[in-house]
């Protein structure tokens, strides 16, 4: 046995031991607290999926035509920065999607984002052809990110990118300017609030890109983000969201 190989054996054993401990630890947690569907509490076979198959099957696909109309209704043609829009599910005020969004946003469960992103990616793989060169999450301003501890759209984007087999590039888009919450603003005020909030960190050389956000309401945030990417030279910019608000 060579010197190098001999010296790497203990390191491998330690790493293997840590992996085993993690595996056993997770297994033990699953026995003590069996993973359950966020919405109906059914037991789940895979701890990393937030919802059971029946709850996922019960979600209603969002009509992309309605999303397109919302983008067209944005002030001064700003919605045209988005080449095509793909909202996955229609928002259900009392249903499974609400439970998932709530867990993602307010209950500090970022790992669900990646799993939900894979669901988005699976639907996109059927409709978005050819695939984009990279997936870019809509960023949070750093103050908001500090409050929440993570950006839920970045978690979704990672799952989408994984499923599409393309890189995820959270660093390509920045949000240097803080904005007010969009919740109680009119369509016009929402656009004014986010217009100019984003900037791209580098030249994007005609690359087709997919923006990922958690929810589409008027589309103003996605359009402002897409505009910043287009200003930096991106090719067509697509927008995918987990949910479409009423
Ligand atoms: Zn369920």
What is each PLM-predicted segment?
Residues 1-246:
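Glycine-rich phosphate/pyrophosphate-handling loop used in enzymes and phosphotransfer proteins
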């Amino acid at each position: 046995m060579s010197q190098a190989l001999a010296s790497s054996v203990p390191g491998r054993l330690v790493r293997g031991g840590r992996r085993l401990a993690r595996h056993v630890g997770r297994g033990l947690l699953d026995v003590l607290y069996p993973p359950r569907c966020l919405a109906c509490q059914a037991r789940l076979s895979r701890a990393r999926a937030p919802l059971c198959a029946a709850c996922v099957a019960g979600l209603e696909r969002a009509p992309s035509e309605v999303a397109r109309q919302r983008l067209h209704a944005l002030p001064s043609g700003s919605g045209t920065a988005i080449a095509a829009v793909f909202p996955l599910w229609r928002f259900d005020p009392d249903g499974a999607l609400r439970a998932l969004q709530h867990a993602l946003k307010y209950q500090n469960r970022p790992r669900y984002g990646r799993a939900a992103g894979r669901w988005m990616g699976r639907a996109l793989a059927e409709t978005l052809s050819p695939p984009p060169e990279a997936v870019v999450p809509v960023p949070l301003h750093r103050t908001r990110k500090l409050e929440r501890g993570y950006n839920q759209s970045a978690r979704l984007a990672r799952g989408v990118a994984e499923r599409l087999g393309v890189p995820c590039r959270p660093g390509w888009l920045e949000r240097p300017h803080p904005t007010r919450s969009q919740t109680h603003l009119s369509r016009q005020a929402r656009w004014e609030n986010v217009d100019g909030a984003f900037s791209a960190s580098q030249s994007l050389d005609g690359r087709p890109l997919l923006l990922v956000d958690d929810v589409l309401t008027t589309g103003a945030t996605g359009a402002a983000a897409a505009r910043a990417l287009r200003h930096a030279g991106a090719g067509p910019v697509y927008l995918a969201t987990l949910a479409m608000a009423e």
